[in-house]
Regions:
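Alpha-helical bundle segments enriched in helix-capping/polar residues
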Residues: 2-409
Length: 409
């Protein structure tokens, strides 16, 4: 262990246990960095192979053009090389993904060392200033550069950050405190789970609060198209009439009747497009933030917990019926379908022919009726695990620090 590490640890009680904790972080960082370097070497090898296959493919295509008598042979070789090139692209992406994953795990372990050794300047995320006129935040150094909040700066989600801040600034009922302590004790030795959760959040990146606010507003707002039965019927009837009138025209029964169907479709679009686009915009703006949390929610839902609070949080993500991660996956697919509006060449003809936007919004609003009121709870559940993991990280780094025992009168 470096001398400066021993000097810092010697200031704290239980330094033997602290040194073992620090050694754990050091070993985890070294193992993750080694794995990342191995995957980087693998990635570089694949990249060189891709370049080689590409150059050989170009040479084969030149031969295909230059030697007409052997085009069948060179065409077959070019096809095989193209398939190999695609396979290498997939493998390269996988290698880079694993490299980044292990690199983030190494950074997580390094950050844990920095917090344990009080290397404040090395910590990446600044702590917010203390709230004005708060009764104890400034006196107890809850926020600021060298503060309790900085020691707990391993949260990886906006809901987790907000929840942890509220816990630091406000009291809790004794029963709630007992449940939190029980959950923290369960998570303290679960270093693999905590590190993987933080690494996943780092890869996802920060989510702007405004993004989540827009999506939550959309999810909790009343449906617009579902109550409009006439509009939904028209969205089915008008495209069917277009198919029927085109058939009448093709078979020379009644020509040009399809023009009426197109006029009807344009009329429906004129009456509904502005409102539909507004809903699409709100949902898709927030979706980009929520998509980053999808993997985190999936990881938490897969974990088996034992304590009351954590089991309740997990149950909130896996209610009877469709699990939160699966439901979010469906929502993402619907929002991707709504993105057709960004393709100017395809959107107008497809929308005129099928009233595509109405059908997509119907699916999104049915999802909203089923899960919209649960979305905020899913974010809160994720925030609970994130905040409790940060507290567990502090408990793991300082094994001799006490858990207060509350006595009820």
């Amino acid at each position: 262990m470096p001398p400066e590490s021993e000097e810092v640890l010697s200031r704290y009680p239980g330094s033997d246990k602290g040194s073992r904790t620090l050694e754990t972080y050091t070993l985890r960082e070294s193992a993750a960095a080694t794995s990342a370097d191995l995957w980087k070497g693998h990635s570089d090898t694949i990249a060189q192979g891709r370049m080689g296959v590409f150059l050989v493919t170009v040479a084969v295509l030149i031969c295909y053009v230059a030697v007409p008598g052997a085009r069948t042979l060179f065409g077959a070789i070019a096809l095989l090389l193209s398939m190999a090139f695609v396979a290498l692209i997939v493998r390269h992406a996988r290698a880079r993904r694993f490299e980044r994953w292990h690199r983030e795990l190494a950074r997580v372990a390094r950050s844990a060392q920095d917090r344990r050794l009080r290397r404040w300047e090395a910590l990446e995320r600044p702590s917010p200033p203390s709230p004005v006129d708060h009764p104890y935040a400034e006196d107890l150094d809850i926020f600021g550069r060298a503060s309790l909040h900085t020691l707990l700066s391993s949260t990886c989600t906006q809901p987790g950050e907000e929840l942890l801040t509220s816990w630091l600034l406000g009291p809790a009922a004794p029963d709630v405190i007992d449940q939190r302590q029980e959950a923290v004790r369960e998570l303290t030795p679960a270093i693999e789970f905590r590190d993987e959760l933080e690494a996943t959040g780092r890869i996802a990146g920060p989510v702007e609060p405004e993004q989540l606010r827009l999506l939550l507003e959309w999810a909790e707002s009343p449906a617009w198209v579902l109550p409009r039965t006439r509009l939904r019927y028209l969205a089915v009837a008008v495209p069917l009439s277009l198919v029927a009138t085109i058939a009448l025209h093709v078979f020379a029964i009644i020509p040009y009747l399809w023009g009426i169907s197109i006029v009807l479709a344009l009329a429906v679009m004129r009456c509904s497009t502005e409102r539909i686009q507004e809903d699409f915009a709100r949902a898709s703006t927030g979706e980009s933030g929520l998509r980053l949390y999808h993997t985190l929610i999936e990881r938490v839902a897969e974990k088996q917990f034992q304590t009351t609070l954590l089991k309740g949080v997990r149950d909130g993500l896996t209610p009877g019926g469709e699990a939160a991660a699966e439901a979010l996956g469906r929502l993402f697919r619907f929002i991707e379908m709504s993105d057709l509006r960004h393709n100017g060449n395809a959107h107008v003809p497809v929308n005129v022919a099928t009233l595509w936007d109405v059908h997509v919004l119907v699916r999104m609003e049915r999802w909203k009726e089923e899960h919209g009121q649960s979305l905020r709870g899913w974010m809160t559940s994720l925030g609970h695990v994130d905040a409790l993991s940060a507290l567990a990280g502090l408990a793991h780094a300082h094994p001799r620090w006490a858990f207060p025992e509350l006595q009820r009168k």
